[in-house]
Amino acid sequence: MANITVYTKNLCSFCSAAKQLLKSRNYPFDEVNMEGDTELMMKVIKESGQRTVPQIFVGDVSVGGYQELSAAVASGEFAELVANT
């Protein structure tokens, strides 16, 4: 199973929702809080192409934010990505 990383910030409801969704489906993940870490935020923006949080990665593959994660989980694409990455 590939490593799942969720990049978050404090007081982010979409971050909480993404983490809860992953937990409810028994996906282990690492959370990286980017609050106050401008260098890390710029790196994640460059890798994901997005300026919002959360940003979810499976290995080096950007899934996107909460809405993209939710859609990918519902369609089965997320399970396939995790299994094949």
Positions of PLM-derived features:
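Non-catalytic, surface beta->alpha helical segment in thiol-disulfide oxidoreductase systems
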Residues: 58-85
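Local sequence-structure signature of Cys/Sec-based thiol-disulfide redox active-site neighborhoods
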Residues: 1-28
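Thioredoxin-like thiol-disulfide oxidoreductase module
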Residues: 33-51, 77, 83-85
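Residues that form or flank phosphate/diphosphate-binding pockets in enzymes
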Residues: 16, 39, 64
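Conserved beta-strand scaffold positions in the cores of enzyme catalytic domains, especially
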Residues: 29-31, 62
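Structural micro-motif
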Residues: 48-57, 67
